[in-house]
Amino acid sequence: MITKNFAVNLSQYYLNLKLSFKQFYQNSNFYDKKISKTKDITFDYKPSPYLLSSIVKYQKKKYKIEDFALETIWQNNLNNKEFKKLNNFFWFFSLDLKSSKKTTQAVINNWINKNNHYNNRGWDFDITSKRIISWLSNHQLTYEGCEEEFKKKFNQSIQKQANHLLNEIKNLSEVENKIIGCAAIILTGLVYKDDNKYLTTGLNFLKKIIKSSINNQGFPKSRDIKQLVLYLKYFIIIREWFKESQNTIPEYIDETIYYLGQSYAFIWQNINQDLLFNGNYNSNNDEFDQYLKRFGYVFKNENKELAGYAVLKNKKVILSMDIGNSPSENFSRFYQSGALSFEVISSGKKLITNSG
């Protein structure tokens, strides 16, 4: 027992030491210099923001940038949720295109001035990934009509943030963050065609994600239904970026979308019900279905069993069951229910939900 506790404490000490060293390194001038290696490149491809409507909650009411209290926008007393929302800049998608470009660009310029040097909170991997996607996708406000000095500063900041993602993505364990970061890196490569390192490296990481985390049936190895939907959304977004930018779509992206789509049809579209297995929750996939229809994606799957899930139904009753094995330890972070979990749904209402 003493030996075991000593080993655990030693392991924890090593991890803490490793984390401390990493934080020291990333806050150093050496790391800043490493990720600051940028080029004078051109913003070529202008991605359409509506391609992201599967992951962005668009509001009917649009706001003008002038409606926000810009003087206090970077105050330090924000809670974690507010901080993430502010610094990932996804709130730009709710801005009216009649907003002042000059004011919008001033907000970005202010952020760059305050955060040009890496800090672990503002440069969190997920926050940085979404910030890149937002800045590039909202180019009508963030980039168009800007002065040359800001244009250069903007391009350098995007590259610097993308360089940080390239440095970090290989060390991530959370696959959800990896796919979002991968999308941001790939978009950077499509936008700035003069530097192919972002596109080449981003696609290489995407292939690794496919190989390491998706099984041969097109279902995440975690058996996580939420993760399946997230994967499908981002793979389609990446495909649409390739299509819109008039680049050849890699075959493995089409193939992955096909198999993910079949899994999505099996687990959701065939029954139009959320199965609350494995940490899943009530979703709003109806909106995603509209997105798929709008972009011409049709998925079908007539199987009764897939990836360890079984679904039997007639006109009124649906019987669903988890008959698969638990995911391996590497993919079990959010796994909750066990084998033989089942649900009975009648006329659209759940009669029995057994988490196993």
Regions found by a protein language model. Name each.
Residues 1-73:
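Extreme N-terminal leader/anchor segments
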Residues 10, 17, 21, 111, ...:
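Generic structural signal of hydrophobic/aromatic residues within well-ordered alpha-helices
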Residues 215-355:
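Carbohydrate-active enzyme catalytic cores, enriched for enzymes
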